[in-house]
């Protein structure tokens, strides 16, 4: 594990905020080149939606991943619930300029990111859960319902990848496992870390050793 690790989440298309944080912590220089050396940047999902600069942030992460590796460092981008939403065609939070672009091109917005595109291919290779050193990273959280599934981290990542480009109905039809992972008690949606324990049945620290890598 590297000496330093910067952990961010939910850029949501806000270039000004995201890029200023990277510069502030010397992850990139003024030309957006990797300057974080052998250290690690972990972004825990949700570049899609709300903001107007989704595409520039994705391309920056795409570029920095290689630059980080060349420098002996690492960039990790994990999937969040909004990656799963947009790629399934749930466009409730997409900024209007992107919807106008899709209309102009006469294709559904999510097709701009399908797995035949370079960024779509890249998104399809992202993990949902990742163990880095002693730290387990996931966008939302882990529920007792999740633990009952008895899935290893690689198995979870495989299931999430298989369902990433399917819509909600297709996920339900594909398998119960895919449907669960993209639903309320799955790793990108579970809210038990911040909401009622009576409803969300949180996982406690003593349960974590049961999560297999």
Q: What feature does the model see in each segment?
A:
Residues 1-213:
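Feature recognizes metal-dependent phosphohydrolase scaffolds
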């Amino acid at each position: 594990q590297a000496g330093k690790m910067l952990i961010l989440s939910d850029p949501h298309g806000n270039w000004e905020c995201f890029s200023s944080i990277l510069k502030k912590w010397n992850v990139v220089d003024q030309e957006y080149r990797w300057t974080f050396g052998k250290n690690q940047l972990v972004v825990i999902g949700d570049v899609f939606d709300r903001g107007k600069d989704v595409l520039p942030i994705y391309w920056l992460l795409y570029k920095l991943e290689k630059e980080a590796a060349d420098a002996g460092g690492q960039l990790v981008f994990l999937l969040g619930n909004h990656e799963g939403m947009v790629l399934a065609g749930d466009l409730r939070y997409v900024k209007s300029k992107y919807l106008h672009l899709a209309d102009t091109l006469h294709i559904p917005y999510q097709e701009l990111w399908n797995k035949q595109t370079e960024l779509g291919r890249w998104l399809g290779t992202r993990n949902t859960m990742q163990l880095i050193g002693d730290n387990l990273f996931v966008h939302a959280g882990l529920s007792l319902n999740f633990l009952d599934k008895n899935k290893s981290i690689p198995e979870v990542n495989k299931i999430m990848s298989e369902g990433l480009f399917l819509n909600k109905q297709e996920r339900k039809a594909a398998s119960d496992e895919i449907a669960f992972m993209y639903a309320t008690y799955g790793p990108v949606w579970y809210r038990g870390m911040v909401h009622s324990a009576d409803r969300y049945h949180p996982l406690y620290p003593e349960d974590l050793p049961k999560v297999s890598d």
